[in-house]
Amino acid sequence: MMSNKKAINILLAEDQTMLRNALATILDLEDNLQVVHSCATGKLALEYMQSDDGAKVDIVLSDIEMPDMTGLELAQHLFEAKARSNTIILTTFARSGYLRRAMDSGVKGYLLKDSPSHELIAAIHKVHQGGAAIAPELMVGSWMEKDPLTDKERRALRLAKDGLSTEDIASKLFLSTGTVRNYLSSASNKLNAKNRIEAARIAHQNGWL
């Protein structure tokens, strides 16, 4: 629903179709909120934001875990590109580490999916006005443990979690197999893990992947 005031244009990135459609309906019913585009992957969201239409987006509302590209990776790309939009993460994950990475990626809002719709709407308005909106239950735990992984270790572990071999990981990251082994070994040592699978599990549970 739109009033005479300029609408806040929203891009919605969520891989669950039913939830994506429900969110779009809720937001479009609100005064001065307009979902101008919705998509199921972070990669599609980034492609839209890099198009001419992307310049009109005020708020990117994104899930974290999506195919091709996570919401945190999407936020990082937009942050580095100095996009005029602001990003709000809406997720089921209250894991330690996610909020820290989100803030480092320029995210201005971080809410859980079980938050009431009025809190989400208020957060969108607050972020659009230059503020920040963080679910209070996330503020303490997310800062207790610092992410010990480098970006390269994180990328290698994420692919290991998906079951890829060292050779396949090396191919995807355009690295030598020896370099990949070093990254995985370093990550395992930092996390006190017995192997790459355990390291990936620990990192995932802490929100570091």
Language model regions located:
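Acidic, metal-coordinating helix/loop segments flanking the phosphotransfer/catalytic sites
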Residues: S38-I59
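Acidic catalytic/metal-coordinating carboxylates
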Residues: T41-L44, T70-L74
